[in-house]
């Protein structure tokens, strides 16, 4: 028997190479609450760079987390799923007004903005602002092969598709108050030229890629993938210090870029990688400022790599921009304490493995880490149905 307050909103499923994260939300007396939340680690090789290698095992994993999410109980057979960010494209463009329909103009110009032929992609668009002589339009596109693969996956898992989204869309919805319906302007009103936007950069450092999203004036401007990942950082530590991947992961989390931890051994190993990340951010930031104008007001860090100790401080110093760790519960009426059994992770590491017996902390290093920001995409997907209802 279903409880009276069981949610009918779709489940948000964030399926990545290494895990599945699930969130279902409900609206109770005007408050957005978590109905179900959970995480399931995937064995290596089931998914590689977003491509599904072992469909049968992935279907089993989806069914498992649906049946037992960890917190709460799933009460919907609909799901909103995120398409692999590295396989998709999203960008704000400007389209001059003309006698032709906007749909026809965008269809004719889509290949100028997406590095694939029109016949190979599904694409969608929405007007984000109307100016005197042009429209600002957000376009998104994904390869048909990937979309069809994920649609079939959900069908095989006995779930109906509520939505398939490009990851930056879900991330922004999960993190920014500007994405809530009450913050949105009425359907693309005429906007005076020169209106000052509120500009964000969002850096999502995931297990197998990093994504930098630029967000201005209540809409995504563009996103860029970077060839840096949490796994790459862990592997570099493992190779350099001859540690197991598990030991290297703990060293990364506990020591990070803090030069006072283990005498800065891990920071030294990561310096070249972080320089590369800073360089890529600078390239994207220069493009944003030169092509779109404006300056970033704030950078938000999310994803597992966003918790690397001292990373935010280094980025803030490099670009003189305020940097914060993202709060994935921003648009929910929840506090994080009730999810601590899932969010909070304790990591311990023996500094002797670093041949660093002189560490001031002693040999045993440990840290309590909140992994809540890794649920950003799943929360953003789950918010979609609620926000649509509120429009």
Identify what each model region corresponds to:
Residues 1-391:
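Hydrophobic/aromatic-enriched cytosolic interaction surfaces used to assemble or bind macromolecules
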């Amino acid at each position: 028997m279903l409880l009276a307050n069981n949610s009918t909103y779709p489940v948000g499923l964030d399926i990545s190479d290494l895990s599945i994260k699930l969130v279902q939300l409900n609206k109770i007396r005007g408050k957005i609450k978590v109905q179900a939340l959970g995480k399931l680690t995937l064995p290596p090789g089931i998914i590689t760079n977003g491509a599904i290698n072992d469909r049968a095992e992935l279907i089993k994993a989806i069914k498992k987390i649906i049946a037992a999410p960890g917190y709460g109980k799933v009460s919907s057979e609909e799901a909103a799923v995120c398409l692999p960010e590295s396989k998709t494209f999203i960008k704000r463009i400007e389209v001059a007004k003309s006698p032709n329909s906007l749909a026809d103009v965008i269809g004719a110009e889509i290949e100028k903005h997406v590095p694939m032929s029109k016949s190979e992609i599904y694409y969608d668009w929405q007007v984000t602002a109307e100016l005197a002589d042009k429209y600002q339009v957000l376009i998104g596109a994904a390869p048909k092969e990937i979309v069809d693969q994920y649609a079939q996956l959900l069908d095989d898992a006995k779930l109906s598709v509520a939505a398939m989204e490009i990851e930056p869309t879900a991330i922004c919805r999960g993190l920014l108050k500007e994405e809530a319906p009450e913050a949105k302007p009425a359907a693309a009103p005429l906007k005076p030229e020169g209106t000052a936007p509120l500009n964000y950069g969002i850096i999502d450092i995931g297990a197998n890629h990093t994504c930098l999203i630029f967000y201005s004036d209540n809409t995504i401007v563009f996103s860029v993938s970077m060839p840096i990942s949490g796994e790459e950082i862990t592997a570099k530590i493992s190779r350099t210090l001859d540690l197991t991947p598990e030991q290297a992961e703990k060293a990364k989390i506990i020591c990070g870029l803090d030069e006072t931890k283990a005498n800065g051994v891990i920071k030294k190993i990561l310096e070249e990688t972080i320089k590369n990340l800073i360089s890529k951010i600078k390239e994207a930031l220069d493009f944003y400022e030169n092509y779109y104008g404006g300056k970033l007001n704030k950078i938000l860090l999310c994803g597992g790599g966003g918790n690397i100790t001292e990373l935010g401080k280094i980025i803030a110093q490099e670009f003189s921009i305020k940097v914060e760790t993202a709060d994935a519960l921003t648009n929910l009426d929840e506090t994080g304490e009730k999810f601590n059994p899932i969010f909070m992770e304790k990591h311990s590491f023996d500094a002797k493995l670093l041949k660093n017996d002189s560490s001031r902390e002693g040999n045993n290093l440990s840290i309590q880490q909140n992994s809540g920001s890794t649920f950003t995409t799943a929360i953003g997907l789950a918010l979609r149905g609620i926000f649509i209802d509120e429009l």
